[in-house]
Amino acid sequence: MLGLKKSFCFLIAAAIIFSTVHFISGCAMTYNGEMLFFSEGCSQCHSFKGKGGRMGPDLSAVTNLRSDSWIDRYIINPTDINPLARMPSFNHLSNSKRKAIIAFLKK
Protein backbone atom coordinates (compact mmCIF):
# COMPACT_ATOMS: atom_id res chain seq x y z
CA MET A 1 0.00 0.00 0.00
CA LEU A 2 2.83 2.36 0.86
CA GLY A 3 4.41 1.67 -2.55
CA LEU A 4 1.20 2.75 -4.29
CA LYS A 5 1.10 6.00 -2.34
CA LYS A 6 4.73 6.75 -3.25
CA SER A 7 4.05 5.99 -6.92
CA PHE A 8 0.95 8.16 -6.91
CA CYS A 9 2.81 11.03 -5.21
CA PHE A 10 5.64 10.69 -7.73
CA LEU A 11 3.18 10.86 -10.64
CA ILE A 12 1.47 13.93 -9.18
CA ALA A 13 4.83 15.66 -8.61
CA ALA A 14 5.98 14.81 -12.15
CA ALA A 15 2.74 16.17 -13.62
CA ILE A 16 3.09 19.42 -11.66
CA ILE A 17 6.72 19.86 -12.70
CA PHE A 18 5.96 19.09 -16.35
CA SER A 19 3.01 21.48 -16.50
CA THR A 20 5.01 24.23 -14.79
CA VAL A 21 7.94 23.84 -17.19
CA HIS A 22 5.53 23.77 -20.14
CA PHE A 23 3.78 26.92 -18.86
CA ILE A 24 7.06 28.76 -18.32
CA SER A 25 8.40 27.80 -21.75
CA GLY A 26 5.10 28.91 -23.29
CA CYS A 27 5.36 32.27 -21.51
CA ALA A 28 8.94 32.67 -22.72
CA MET A 29 7.89 31.88 -26.29
CA THR A 30 5.06 34.42 -26.11
CA TYR A 31 7.43 37.04 -24.69
CA ASN A 32 10.00 36.35 -27.42
CA GLY A 33 7.25 36.54 -30.03
CA GLU A 34 6.17 39.93 -28.74
CA MET A 35 9.75 41.20 -28.90
CA LEU A 36 10.09 39.85 -32.45
CA PHE A 37 6.74 41.36 -33.51
CA PHE A 38 8.14 44.79 -32.68
CA SER A 39 11.84 44.31 -33.54
CA GLU A 40 11.29 42.62 -36.92
CA GLY A 41 8.99 45.40 -38.08
CA CYS A 42 5.62 43.63 -38.00
CA SER A 43 4.26 46.46 -35.84
CA GLN A 44 5.24 49.09 -38.40
CA CYS A 45 2.30 47.99 -40.53
CA HIS A 46 0.17 45.78 -38.26
CA SER A 47 -1.49 46.54 -34.96
CA PHE A 48 -2.11 44.06 -32.19
CA LYS A 49 -4.54 44.92 -29.41
CA GLY A 50 -4.26 48.63 -30.10
CA LYS A 51 -0.48 48.87 -30.50
CA GLY A 52 1.31 49.24 -33.81
CA GLY A 53 0.73 50.49 -37.32
CA ARG A 54 -2.43 50.94 -39.31
CA MET A 55 -1.30 50.21 -42.88
CA GLY A 56 -1.78 46.43 -42.63
CA PRO A 57 -4.64 44.57 -41.00
CA ASP A 58 -5.03 44.40 -37.24
CA LEU A 59 -3.77 40.98 -36.15
CA SER A 60 -5.58 40.84 -32.78
CA ALA A 61 -7.96 38.10 -33.96
CA VAL A 62 -5.95 36.50 -36.77
CA THR A 63 -5.46 33.23 -34.87
CA ASN A 64 -9.25 32.89 -34.59
CA LEU A 65 -9.55 33.15 -38.36
CA ARG A 66 -6.45 31.32 -39.64
CA SER A 67 -4.51 28.21 -38.65
CA ASP A 68 -0.95 28.35 -37.34
CA SER A 69 0.33 26.72 -40.54
CA TRP A 70 -1.50 29.27 -42.71
CA ILE A 71 -0.02 32.17 -40.72
CA ASP A 72 3.43 30.57 -40.91
CA ARG A 73 3.20 30.18 -44.70
CA TYR A 74 2.00 33.77 -45.02
CA ILE A 75 4.92 35.07 -42.97
CA ILE A 76 7.36 33.10 -45.14
CA ASN A 77 5.96 34.27 -48.48
CA PRO A 78 2.70 36.25 -48.53
CA THR A 79 2.44 36.34 -52.32
CA ASP A 80 2.23 32.53 -52.44
CA ILE A 81 -1.16 32.87 -50.73
CA ASN A 82 -2.23 36.26 -52.04
CA PRO A 83 -0.49 37.42 -55.24
CA LEU A 84 -1.58 41.00 -54.49
CA ALA A 85 -0.09 41.03 -50.97
CA ARG A 86 1.97 44.12 -50.18
CA MET A 87 3.63 42.49 -47.19
CA PRO A 88 7.27 41.55 -47.80
CA SER A 89 8.53 38.02 -47.29
CA PHE A 90 9.97 37.24 -43.87
CA ASN A 91 11.53 33.96 -44.99
CA HIS A 92 14.74 35.00 -43.22
CA LEU A 93 13.05 34.29 -39.87
CA SER A 94 13.82 30.86 -38.42
CA ASN A 95 11.05 28.38 -37.75
CA SER A 96 11.37 29.00 -33.99
CA LYS A 97 11.08 32.77 -34.45
CA ARG A 98 7.97 32.39 -36.61
CA LYS A 99 6.45 30.03 -34.03
CA ALA A 100 7.19 32.57 -31.30
CA ILE A 101 5.43 35.33 -33.24
CA ILE A 102 2.42 33.07 -33.78
CA ALA A 103 2.39 32.21 -30.05
CA PHE A 104 2.34 35.94 -29.29
CA LEU A 105 -0.57 36.48 -31.69
CA LYS A 106 -2.54 33.82 -29.77
CA LYS A 107 -2.17 35.76 -26.52
PLM features per residue range, with description:
Residues F38-S39, S47, A61, S89:
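Phosphate-coordinating loops and pocket residues in cytosolic domains that bind phosphorylated ligands
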Residues M1-S25:
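Sec-dependent bacterial lipoprotein signal peptides
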Residues E40-S43, P57, S69, A85:
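Glycine-centered loop/turn positions within well-structured domains
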Residues S19-F38, P57:
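Electrostatic cytochrome c docking/interface patches
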